[in-house]
């Protein structure tokens, strides 16, 4: 990333504090957005709202957050706001 230049955000972004359901069923809370230090892409930082998670926080590229996926033969949005 060029110092002082922040990549543009798309019009639709998750907001810190919002809760989302992953297409497989688990719930997550958005912590915020971050810029990947090597790739200059926006990342969503989120935490699981279920017990025994593999990590305290996760990240996912913002462009994947609302993308469509096929799960058990059904098209779903990767994360749906609850």
Residue spans for each PLM region:
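Mixed-charge, low-complexity intrinsically disordered regions
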Residues: 1-82
């Amino acid at each position: 990333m060029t110092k002082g230049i922040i990549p543009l955000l798309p019009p639709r972004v998750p907001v810190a504090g919002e809760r989302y359901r992953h297409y497989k069923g688990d719930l997550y809370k958005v912590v915020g957005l971050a810029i990947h230090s090597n790739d200059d892409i926006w990342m969503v930082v989120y935490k699981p709202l279920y017990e025994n998670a593999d990590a305290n926080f996760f990240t996912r590229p913002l462009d994947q957050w609302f993308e469509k996926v096929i799960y058990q033969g059904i098209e779903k949005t990767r994360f749906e706001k609850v």
